[in-house]
């Protein structure tokens, strides 16, 4: 396919146009008075959201250079969302500000490499100040305040705080759709591990890219499965029972995997295969944990069990299993409560006996998965459109709250960035274009607060200047228009969110500034429509 190439200023400006189109659509959602964006869907009702990454994903541009610029910023939003669960809009606004200021300096003759180095040093300094200002979360009320800001709803915040309080920070919190109007919390025993499906063809919910089974059998094998002949006897028994099957094994490949996939596609038999978590002895221990939780047995030749001789009573069971590309969650395993309690006590004893910090950490992870359980938040709404939007908000708020528990919180509303920036730049000693690069960050850290003020109908420059000179932790409550102690007022952000947003935005900005050429696919011209054989006459 033919390519088109742009150089120098033309290349950078093309990328910037794409960035600006995307950022302008996303930034209107920032803050308590941010607006929503309506996303058209090819099928079904449109989605109404104020989530930066959801909006960014939907934007596709015609111009090839603008498209590349937009894709780079999508990466900022997606990476921030993956790491912290929130801060996507903040990251996009920061990226736009960094690129705008940076390109202005490049056009004025500054050295892009030195600018990038200056940006990186300034961002590192601001990040250190953010960490130093962090306040650890200790109470349920503080978790609720953080989750409430992300969800934009204090009721949801309280439910999330209750969920995290019950299952602990190591526990699992999932969100499901409810048939009722309200939002309620259900606590269920369960386990999650970091291995997903081995083939995308196992997916049962294409929109969420998940395989979800109710009342499923679980086959746990401590070896590799390649030969379908070994697997067929137990698969036949499961088909006759009318249930679905989750296979957890060292690996499933070759004709065994191919046969399972073909049967799923043809609708003959629903199954999903995942790799067992961990390695070596740790894998054996985790498989035994899963077996005890689900009431099954680990199929291993060392204990005299062969795959071809497996019967249904050796399989585990669970009320529900949810498998994504990265994770498997087992909810309400059919194991015996006494055996589970004994296993939990055994792991606690091992934690007490080990001298290795690494082993202790891994044992605590296993304990959390066995004993912590799963909290399920059931979201309800009047319409399907509202339900999707509400569910998405709750999922973001859960990850936001977990990030807060992990690294602590700082003043929200863009205040922490401005005030951390002020302290960082007083200490930075840079020269030449590196100092110019640091100054780009100095200007950019104001951008989130300015956008929040703009969305609230206030004068951005005046607000930013006033907040910069307020005591540490004090800033604008955009919901009321008052200047308050942000943490005392319950307006906070997890450090992880703010830090990730700044780091990811700076990373992309550095790429923009040091770009000297862009190579893109030449857009294909659509063929002219065929002529009307009737000559346009109405026969």
Swiss-Prot record:
Question: What InterPro entries does the record tag this protein with?
Answer: Chaperonin_Cpn60_CS, Cpn60/GroEL, Cpn60/GroEL/TCP-1, GroEL-like_apical_dom_sf, GROEL-like_equatorial_sf, TCP-1-like_intermed_sf
> One biological process GO term for this chain?
protein refolding
Keywords, ordered alphabetically = ATP-binding, Chaperone, Cytoplasm, Isomerase, Nucleotide-binding
- EC number(s)? 5.6.1.7
Q: What is its main location?
A: cytoplasm
Binding-site residues, ATP? 29-32, 86-90, 413, 477-479, 493
Enzyme class per UniProt? isomerase
The superkingdom of the source organism is Bacteria
Which is one GO molecular function term here? isomerase activity
Q: Where in the cell is it found?
A: Cytoplasm
Under catalytic activity, the entry for this protein gives:
ATP + H2O + a folded polypeptide = ADP + phosphate + an unfolded polypeptide
Keyword DNA-binding set for record:
no
Q: Which Pfam families match?
A: Cpn60_TCP1
Give any Gene Ontology cellular component. cytoplasm
What is this protein's function? Together with its co-chaperonin GroES, plays an essential role in assisting protein folding. The GroEL-GroES system forms a nano-cage that allows encapsulation of the non-native substrate proteins and provides a physical environment optimized to promote and accelerate protein folding.
As for family, the record states:
Belongs to the chaperonin (HSP60) family.
Assembly notes? Forms a cylinder of 14 subunits composed of two heptameric rings stacked back-to-back. Interacts with the co-chaperonin GroES.
- From the Swiss-Prot or TrEMBL record, give the protein name: Chaperonin GroEL
Q: Give the source species.
A: Clavibacter michiganensis subsp. michiganensis (strain NCPPB 382)
Gene that this sequence comes from? groEL
